[in-house]
């Protein structure tokens, strides 16, 4: 789960989300992106001040993250 958090942080440093954002990961990796007890999403929420959710995108490779602001 730390690998997905690092990938998301790297992506978001460039994107700087200003509104609620969906993070996309490959199929079956939603819980790894979310983190145990949602800790990864809480870290991102505190750092950027916006809400994050996680969804799946089968076109992505393992450890690849894509974001989309709502």
Task: Please provide the spans of the model-predicted regions.
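Auxiliary Fe-S-binding modules of radical SAM enzymes
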Residues: 1-70
């Amino acid at each position: 789960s730390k690998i997905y958090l690092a990938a998301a942080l790297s992506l978001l440093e460039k994107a700087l989300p200003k509104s609620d954002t969906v993070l996309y990961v490959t199929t079956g990796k939603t819980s790894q992106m979310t983190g145990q007890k949602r800790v990864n999403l809480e870290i991102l929420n505190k750092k950027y001040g916006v809400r994050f959710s996680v969804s799946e995108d089968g076109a992505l490779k393992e450890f690849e993250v894509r974001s989309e602001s709502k």
